[in-house]
Amino acid sequence: MAAVQAAEVKVDGSEPKLSKNELKRRLKAEKKVAEKEAKQKELSEKQLSQATAAATNHTTDNGVGPEEESVDPNQYYKIRSQAIHQLKVNGEDPYPHKFHVDISLTDFIQKYSHLQPGDHLTDITLKVAGRIHAKRASGGKLIFYDLRGEGVKLQVMANSRNYKSEEEFIHINNKLRRGDIIGVQGNPGKTKKGELSIIPYEITLLSPCLHMLPHLHFGLKDKETRYRQRYLDLILNDFVRQKFIIRSKIITYIRSFLDELGFLEIETPMMNIIPGGAVAKPFITYHNELDMNLYMRIAPELYHKMLVVGGIDRVYEIGRQFRNEGIDLTHNPEFTTCEFYMAYADYHDLMEITEKMVSGMVKHITGSYKVTYHPDGPEGQAYDVDFTPPFRRINMVEELEKALGMKLPETNLFETEETRKILDDICVAKAVECPPPRTTARLLDKLVGEFLEVTCINPTFICDHPQIMSPLAKWHRSKEGLTERFELFVMKKEICNAYTELNDPMRQRQLFEEQAKAKAAGDDEAMFIDENFCTALEYGLPPTAGWGMGIDRVAMFLTDSNNIKEVLLFPAMKPEDKKENVATTDTLESTTVGTSV
């Protein structure tokens, strides 16, 4: 209406004169809107009244509360909050400090699943706890609960005859709703139909759920809600819990594997004066006491190599890295990596270690070397990824020449402007996008992504990168212009990067200076010159090989997840208020189109 009125305002600001028919039409429309609002308000008040009555009436369906769950979620929250407040007024504590648990739900099921239908072990009393996911009444004296926790379900069969009095039975069970966390004291048993249950004589409310819990039958499928309210996702979706158990197993396996090889786990700073160790755009923060900007680490590499200089020959770190770059299905601004550095080794040694670690991890976690993966989601095409060693190995430049069907300049000429122009022309001819700055390194990276990475379904080592793409890697001992580096790709995605480390301080400083020129030319991802690191190299870094793995992507493959948010407990999300502001702006823009004079 406001947009219509705005459109009808005259240039001189005076109100337009409406015809009788138009005035009548508008009054009729306004009356209709008012009647609709009044009717909705009356309906809401009626629902609220019914639900409140159900919440306080102890004779209604033993408090299962279908009337409550038919109301608006906001009204449900109000009703539930009032009920919990009333418990406090009556001297009851809905949030007790402690409840002793004798046995987990998992152990209970394992220990008593052998019982026969109709068994009731009255001589065994146990305490268990969990969250109510369903509540069903069978008459006035028998109530069943589905108690969930630890990824399993146990039935609670509450019978009034097992309580001190029927009044006590009614009182406690009327307090409980779906979503509440309860403690149950009772006996193991099985129903006549063979359902393993705990048969209580006492139930304690440990923490009420004030919000209406979605029904398990419908589940929680909205991804936006799942990622923003991960706790709710975990409550309702058992498969989510399993994904994070697998993620934890991946980290545990890697840590154990490296420990057995004699590596020392270390911790290095997450805030750095100079961001180094990778080609990436950093986050910037500010230190009040030092009165200076600091950079969140993009990689821990340089610190690790300093420790190898100091005589710790085998080091590793599992931790968070931060890169101020895009968010998509495989990238998150903060992510988890494992990096290790091994003195007296080269990239050939690390390829063997990688094969053993990755294939062993897949076999340990899944029971097989083969994993089924759906890159486009559950409804898309399935791929069988075979992690059986040895993995395929290809030379980057040679394979790129085969894929392009043409010979590239000699690798010792890759740093020339002529080579850059040739690669630029190839990208244009092949319709390969490369945002500026169109440096040789970036052009090569885009071509490799377009023609080589897409062929890597099973684990594949892409080896011997050009020096211009690898400022921290050591030059190839037999191929000028290349480095002793490899990347491991699975399902077209990189999961590992490793190389024989550059330990010549003069050469390292020269490469840093070339990176500085690239940064000056507009490449935000180019490296800074790190003088402290160069000084450390001057004390002598032994022949060393370094390795890094993206834990999140490995977790994606082993949990069959095509979105990195599925394997991050709390992924980066745009704030909801910001989203609302954007939506409001869009709405305002759409309603004011054509209204300008």
Curated annotation (Swiss-Prot):
Annotated control of activity: Up-regulated by DARS and EEF1A1, but not by AIMP2.
Known outcome of mutating L105H: In CMTRIB; severely affects enzyme activity
Outcome after substituting E525K: In LEPID; uncertain significance
Chain positions with Phosphoserine modification: S207, S590, S596
Gene Ontology biological process terms from the UniProt entry: basophil activation involved in immune response; diadenosine tetraphosphate biosynthetic process; ERK1 and ERK2 cascade; lysyl-tRNA aminoacylation; positive regulation of DNA-templated transcription; positive regulation of inflammatory response to antigenic stimulus; positive regulation of macrophage activation; response to X-ray
Modified residues (Phosphothreonine): T591
Lineage: superkingdom: Eukaryota
PTM statement from Swiss-Prot or TrEMBL: Phosphorylated on a serine residue after mast cell stimulation with immunoglobulin E (IgE).
Enzyme Commission identifier(s): 2.7.7.-, 6.1.1.6
Tagged with keyword Secreted: yes
Protein keywords: Acetylation, Aminoacyl-tRNA synthetase, ATP-binding, Cell membrane, Charcot-Marie-Tooth disease, Cytoplasm, Deafness, Disease variant, Host-virus interaction, Intellectual disability, Ligase, Membrane, Mitochondrion, Neurodegeneration, Neuropathy, Non-syndromic deafness, Nucleotide-binding, Nucleus, Phosphoprotein, Protein biosynthesis, Secreted, Transferase
Notes on the domains: The N-terminal domain (1-65) of the cytoplasmic isoform is a functional tRNA-binding domain, is required for nuclear localization, is involved in the interaction with DARS, but has a repulsive role in the binding to EEF1A1. A central domain (208-259) is involved in homodimerization and is required for interaction with HIV-1 GAG and incorporation into virions. The C-terminal domain (452-597) is not required for interaction with AIMP2.
Assembly: Homodimer and tetradimer. Part of the multisynthetase complex (MSC), a multisubunit complex that groups tRNA ligases for Arg (RARS), Asp (DARS), Gln (QARS), Ile (IARS), Leu (LARS), Lys (KARS), Met (MARS) the bifunctional ligase for Glu and Pro (EPRS) and the auxiliary subunits AIMP1/p43, AIMP2/p38 and EEF1E1/p18. Interacts with AIMP2 (via N-terminus) and MITF. Interacts with TARSL2. (Microbial infection) Interacts directly with HIV-1 virus GAG protein.
HAMAP family, sorted: Lys_tRNA_synth_class2
Disease: Charcot-Marie-Tooth disease, recessive intermediate B: A form of Charcot-Marie-Tooth disease, a disorder of the peripheral nervous system, characterized by progressive weakness and atrophy, initially of the peroneal muscles and later of the distal muscles of the arms. Recessive intermediate forms of Charcot-Marie-Tooth disease are characterized by clinical and pathologic features intermediate between demyelinating and axonal peripheral neuropathies, and motor median nerve conduction velocities ranging from 25 to 45 m/sec.
Function: Catalyzes the specific attachment of an amino acid to its cognate tRNA in a 2 step reaction: the amino acid (AA) is first activated by ATP to form AA-AMP and then transferred to the acceptor end of the tRNA. When secreted, acts as a signaling molecule that induces immune response through the activation of monocyte/macrophages. Catalyzes the synthesis of the signaling molecule diadenosine tetraphosphate (Ap4A), and thereby mediates disruption of the complex between HINT1 and MITF and the concomitant activation of MITF transcriptional activity.
UniProt protein name: Lysine--tRNA ligase
Name of the gene encoding the protein in the UniProt record: KARS1
